[in-house]
């Protein structure tokens, strides 16, 4: 294992290239199994989650070549059973269900792993595939799914307790593109990553209308073809670096971003007194930390609301912002494990019933802290940049799941960080 050692207090200046979206890459890679023709996906981030997905696809029989951010997939000879050893490491592996069912009418997928941040049930995925005519059994920790007569189009409502499901929408779209007839997805997720998947599927020859709205209509086709596709920028990585710049920046420029996807984070940072300016094309943004930052309030919500994947980072910002800030997570109310570690660094945070109340303190102090999940680890890195002294962040593998070369990118803008072997874990 490795740890990240951060020496706090250094001003951040310079430029960073934002990677392609991890959350878009995973279902797009899975969707490449829908055709036996070659597919090339560009700007796939080199993070452990995409590496796991590539390994699983190879185990399923696909030929997968990876080079300099490009992934070439040719899935001529597939088999339908995914291995537990890789699937257990990544929650998003459930999105293999849709392509395998569409292509082979059968799949066996171990119930997946990933971040442990509260209940993330696969019930909606199961309900959706059953609506298309599949039979589902759970045996010895495996989902065994079969549709001997093929998948048939249907109307499926994906509404859940905490809003639309992104991976559920992805999975159902992928299953429906080769199904017989028309599939209508009600209460669909409208995140940019869902739209990117729909654009990729459309390039392959799928007939999809309404992606980006709450109602998606898919007319099944007989066959999909190969294509080339470039993944959208990672809005969560961009947001994380925007917050880092708001905490310690004196002119940090982020390239390869999408202004349209960053609206809610941009508006919040400006409201809290920080300077955020995009270029005319909306693909480059410069952030300068405000001299008189203000406290704020956020409530997570499905897109275009404030993303749950950005609440931990904003909590780190609020920890040293004067006044009382409030963070409420309506999507994953248990997603506050980072707060206990921030408190070890001197933060004043009270968490109750899915809400964190943060009283800003003047300074944080470096301390040994433990990452508990992907975005929590990002929050700890941000806090460490601001803290006085040295912080050691253990279980660095969490952050490597979703941030490409974060230590190198931070070094490029003036942070004092080093990745070291973790002898304590």
UniProtKB/Swiss-Prot annotation:
Coiled coil: none
Modified residues (2-(S-cysteinyl)pyruvic acid O-phosphothioketal): 115
Pathway entry: Cell wall biogenesis; peptidoglycan biosynthesis
Locations listed in the record: Cytoplasm
Annotated keywords: Cell cycle, Cell division, Cell shape, Cell wall biogenesis/degradation, Cytoplasm, Peptidoglycan synthesis, Pyruvate, Transferase
Recorded GO MF terms: UDP-N-acetylglucosamine 1-carboxyvinyltransferase activity
Binding site for UDP-N-acetyl-alpha-D-glucosamine: 91, 120-124, 309, 331
One GO biological process term: UDP-N-acetylgalactosamine biosynthetic process
Pfam families recorded: EPSP_synthase
Gene3D superfamilies found in the cross-reference section: Enolpyruvate transferase domain
Record keyword Transferase present: yes
Active site as annotated: 115
Catalytic activity: phosphoenolpyruvate + UDP-N-acetyl-alpha-D-glucosamine = UDP-N-acetyl-3-O-(1-carboxyvinyl)-alpha-D-glucosamine + phosphate
KW Chaperone (keyword) present: no
Principal cellular location given in the protein's record: cytoplasm
InterPro entries per the UniProt record, alphabetical: Enolpyruvate_Tfrase_dom, Enolpyruvate_Tfrase_sf, MurA_subfamily, RNA3'P_cycl/enolpyr_Trfase_a/b, UDP_GlcNAc_COvinyl_MurA
GO cellular component, one term: cytoplasm
UniProt-listed PANTHER family: UDP-N-ACETYLGLUCOSAMINE 1-CARBOXYVINYLTRANSFERASE
Family named by the database record: Belongs to the EPSP synthase family. MurA subfamily.
Function comment: Cell wall formation. Adds enolpyruvyl to UDP-N-acetylglucosamine.
NCBIfam families found in the cross-reference section: murA, PRK09369.1
Name of this protein: UDP-N-acetylglucosamine 1-carboxyvinyltransferase
Organism encoding this protein: Akkermansia muciniphila (strain ATCC BAA-835 / DSM 22959 / JCM 33894 / BCRC 81048 / CCUG 64013 / CIP 107961 / Muc)
High-level lineage: Bacteria, Pseudomonadati, Verrucomicrobiota, Verrucomicrobiia, Verrucomicrobiales
Name of the gene encoding the protein in the UniProt record: murA
């Amino acid at each position: 294992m490795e740890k990240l050692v951060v020496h706090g207090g250094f001003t951040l200046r310079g430029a960073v290239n934002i990677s392609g979206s991890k959350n878009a890459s995973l279902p797009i890679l899975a969707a490449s199994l829908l055709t036996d023709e070659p597919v090339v996906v560009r700007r796939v981030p080199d993070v452990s989650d995409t590496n796991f997905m590539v390994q699983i696809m190879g185990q399923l029989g696909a030929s997968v070549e990876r080079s300099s951010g490009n992934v070439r997939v040719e899935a001529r000879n597939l088999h339908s059973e995914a291995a537990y050893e890789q699937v257990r490491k990544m929650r998003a592996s459930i999105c293999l269900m849709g392509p395998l069912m569409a292509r082979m009418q059968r799949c066996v997928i171990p119930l997946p792993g990933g971040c442990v941040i509260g209940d993330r049930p696969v019930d909606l995925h199961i309900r959706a595939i059953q609506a298309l005519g599949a039979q589902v059994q759970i045996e010895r920790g495996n989902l065994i799914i079969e549709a001997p007569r093929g998948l048939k189009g249907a109307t499926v409502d994906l509404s859940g307790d905490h809003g639309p499901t992104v991976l559920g929408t992805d999975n159902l779209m992928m299953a429906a593109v080769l199904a017989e007839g028309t599939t209508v997805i009600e209460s669909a997720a409208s995140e940019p990553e869902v739209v990117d998947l729909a654009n990729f599927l459309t390039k392959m020859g799928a007939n999809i209308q309404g992606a980006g709205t709450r109602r998606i209509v898919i007319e099944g086709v007989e066959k999909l073809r190969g294509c080339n596709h470039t993944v959208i920028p990672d809005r969560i990585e961009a947001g994380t670096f925007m917050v880092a710049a708001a905490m310690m920046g004196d002119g940090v420029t982020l390239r390869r971003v999408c202004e349209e996807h960053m609206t809610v984070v941009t508006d919040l940072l400006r409201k809290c007194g920080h300077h955020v300016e995009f270029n005319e094309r909306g693909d480059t943004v410069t952030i300068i930390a405000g001299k008189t930052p203000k406290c704020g309030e956020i409530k997570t919500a499905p897109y275009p609301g404030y993303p749950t994947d950005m609440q931990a980072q904003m909590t780190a910002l609020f920890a040293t912002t004067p006044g009382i800030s409030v963070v409420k997570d309506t999507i994953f109310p248990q997603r506050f494990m980072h707060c206990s570690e921030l408190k070890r660094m001197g933060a004043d945070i009270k968490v109750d019933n899915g809400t964190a109340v943060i009283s800003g303190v003047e300074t944080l102090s470096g301390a040994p802290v433990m990452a508990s999940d992907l975005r929590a680890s990002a929050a700890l890195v941000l806090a460490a940049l601001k803290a006085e002294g040295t912080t050691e962040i253990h279980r660095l593998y969490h952050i490597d799941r979703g941030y490409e070369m974060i230590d190198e990118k931070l070094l490029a803008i003036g942070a004092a960080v080093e990745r070291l072997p973790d002898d304590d874990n």
